[in-house]
Amino acid sequence: MPTIQQLIRTEREKARQKTKSPALKQCPQRRGVCTRVYTTTPKKPNSALRKVARVRLTSGFEVTAYIPGIGHNLQEHSVVMIRGGRVKDLPGVRYHIIRGTLDTAGVKDRKQGRSKYGTKRPKEAKK
């Protein structure tokens, strides 16, 4: 416990909050280039083949980002936009690729939650 005199001399240091997405450098999104697109398996007790990509960002970081939705058109050298947001059952995956921007196509035949997957509104069927 410091004395009052010690506190006058040097005030207490504020506890700094550590960011959960350092590669974004305080920006909401970042652009990057895919260096590798592959599938990986989640932690126990889940089982699947999750689609992920290794992305080199304009901020200089190389991160692993999750590709949401069913099916994708990404390959090496695709230019993508990433946002923060981890995938709970994939250790080390702290970013999501934004569908429907740059080289990433939206999810085909998506009817609900379209804005999250970059899908345009479907044309109404003519009667």
From Swiss-Prot:
Stretches the record annotates as Disordered: 8-28, 102-127
Q: What keywords would UniProt list here?
A: Methylation, Ribonucleoprotein, Ribosomal protein, RNA-binding, rRNA-binding, tRNA-binding
Signal peptide extent: none
User: A Pfam family matched by this chain, by name?
Assistant: Ribosom_S12_S23
Q: Which SUPFAM superfamilies match?
A: Nucleic acid-binding proteins
Supply the Gene3D superfamilies for this chain.
Answer: Nucleic acid-binding proteins
Named from the GO MF annotations, one term is: structural constituent of ribosome
Gene Ontology annotations for the cellular component aspect, listed alphabetically: small ribosomal subunit
> Please, one GO biological process term?
translation
Compositionally biased intervals (Basic residues): 113-127
Q: In this chain, where does the modification 3-methylthioaspartic acid occur?
A: D89
Describe, as the record does, how this protein assembles with itself and its partners.
Answer: Part of the 30S ribosomal subunit. Contacts proteins S8 and S17. May interact with IF1 in the 30S initiation complex.
**Protein's job:** With S4 and S5 plays an important role in translational accuracy.
**According to its UniProt record, which protein family does this protein belong to?**
Belongs to the universal ribosomal protein uS12 family.
Query: Under what name is this protein listed?
Result: Small ribosomal subunit protein uS12
Q: Which organism is it from?
A: Nostoc sp. (strain PCC 7120 / SAG 25.82 / UTEX 2576)
